[in-house]
């Protein structure tokens, strides 16, 4: 099979940095899908992305589709010819459609008779004839939320397109894509190297970009260079660079030839909480902060330039000049905020609406204060500290710093509380009330902080559900899904003895007459229990295990988790499948029972296998009772797994629905007791 390397590059104006990698990988995936759909073989696909280009290189691409054998069946021989042996009109029409005569058709014999058939070999199309449409289709399927038009063109793309290059080996593929005539011209760096130049062969890419255009097209290589050089620059200062992967990839998407440099700022700014300085450095300027070995912020930062002059001093001074006003603002806001105690911000919360039907932020604060105290009492936290933290929880939203740097909410509350002399647990709780902020985020460290974090999230869930504004589809403006998962994670991972029904009932009572949904408690609890499914599926736990536990609707998250772990473990037993099937059978039998079911009567057992199961069930009922009380569900199901043999023997030798009512009633009692033992943990009849 003859192959050539294929290159497609789309040269654009600066692409959105946060979307660049996603666009590049989607482009490569779409190209791969197009090739596979066309039946074109290839060895490997590589993708490239810089601020001003998306490119895909396909290695060892077949230069033509493979030939295909086709077989088109026609009419049955019996109906293809008339009594004189002449082809019928139906046979002639079929043959004409195949481009042959009836006489040229083959015949095939099947179990349903003999049929006319046309067999032929269809040559595959040359790859070069397919590529333009494939690339256009791949581009049209890119995840572009807001495409744009430019100049007088009618086509749309994420940014204006200037060049399109398609090379199959050394052959330029002719055509037009996105309103641009395909050419073998690519553009270099905006300031370094040649502005544009010709590429003669797909194999020259991406090296020709580096050699002539001063562009490193490989995204992963640029990322590695930035990471390596940033770590080295920080180490030279005796520090460690704070390099989060999201910011690293964003910076990688901003430069075509990275040059990692270090700049500094005045040490006086270190009197401002580090989080505020870091917020503006990372969020606004895309800089990497540097910390010493003890975790203290150093008066230096790392930035990445897209140019590489012999003397970088002007670039360094320029970045220092840019960041200085932002740090000065943070310093001013901090000093201004310190002139007023955090608690003195409470009256201002009355001027900010949380939600029209649910009141102001002050109303929410009062509810959080009360609910924090309720939760603290239940989990053994300091009630007064929890209530104090709840009272102060939203005060920092009124400060100058948080108004300007919104992502510092919580952490600035912590710093201001410390300055005011609040208890350390109270101060820390103000920061940790928002934890977990995202999937996999850390949880609050203290029970006081857990109390406030839970109260805040439950108040939001109860309030929004209470006015009928629960999430619909992808719309979740109050982030209720995240709040619900946060509640579950805190309770489960901290092993807190809390019941969702009790918490939501307490929360509901704090809203007075504001709530209109009378089913709010059930709605919120069901919503939170439903979030367990997504959480456990991410952990790889089978859906039927989750459903088996959900069927029992345990409303204590820590208890729910213990049941899920137990059922998941139970599924590994050899006896699990048989016992699940037996429980399905028991459920069906009991559903059809037409008499009252009482307690097991051993003296009424007439069959040996019947008595054996009855005795086993009664014995296990006593054995598992203390295990259930301790929520040791794994031990419960391990014990119940021993019932497989007596259960199998029972169904093999005993007629449950005996004609004698007393026998039938007792046998139903045995099965009812058996079922109830398993239902103490979960409905294992739902296991597949």
From Swiss-Prot:
Q: What intrachain disulfides are recorded?
A: none
Q: Name one GO biological process term.
A: glycyl-tRNA aminoacylation
Under Enzyme Commission nomenclature, its number is 6.1.1.14
Q: Which domain of life is it from?
A: Bacteria
Q: Name one GO cellular component term.
A: cytosol
Where it sits in the cell: the answer is: Cytoplasm
Keywords from UniProt, A to Z, are: Aminoacyl-tRNA synthetase, ATP-binding, Cytoplasm, Ligase, Nucleotide-binding, Protein biosynthesis
Gene Ontology MF terms: arginine-tRNA ligase activity; ATP binding; glycine-tRNA ligase activity
| Catalytic reaction annotation | tRNA(Gly) + glycine + ATP = glycyl-tRNA(Gly) + AMP + diphosphate
Q: Which family does it belong to?
A: Belongs to the class-II aminoacyl-tRNA synthetase family.
What's the subunit arrangement here?
Tetramer of two alpha and two beta subunits.
Q: Which NCBIfam families match?
A: glyS (TIGR00211)
**How is this protein named in the record?**
Glycine--tRNA ligase beta subunit
